[in-house]
Every structure is written in structure tokens, then in C-alpha cells.
UniProtKB/Swiss-Prot annotation:
Pfam family membership, one: PqqA
Organism ancestry: Bacteria, Pseudomonadati, Pseudomonadota, Gammaproteobacteria, Moraxellales
One example of a Gene Ontology biological process annotation: pyrroloquinoline quinone biosynthetic process
Involved pathway(s): Cofactor biosynthesis; pyrroloquinoline quinone biosynthesis
Protein name as it appears in the record: Coenzyme PQQ synthesis protein A
Record bears the keyword Transcription: no
HAMAP family membership: PQQ_syn_PqqA
Function comment: Required for coenzyme pyrroloquinoline quinone (PQQ) biosynthesis. PQQ is probably formed by cross-linking a specific glutamate to a specific tyrosine residue and excising these residues from the peptide.
InterPro entries: PQQ_synth_PqqA (IPR011725)
Gene from which this protein is expressed: pqqA
Variant or mutagenesis effect after changing E16D: Abolishes PQQ biosynthesis
Amino acid sequence: MQWTKPAFTDLRIGFEVTMYFEAR
């Protein structure tokens, strides 16, 4: 997966942040 779409990147970052807070 080498997508360079801003939307996809923003979604991935948002998902990682959500998982980070959920892990806490």
C-alpha cells in the first residue's frame, strides 16, 4: 500500500491516534 492521497494519510493517522487513546 503506497497511497499518497492526503485523505488516506489523514484517515490512517486519525485511526492510529484513536487506537493509541483506546489502548490507554
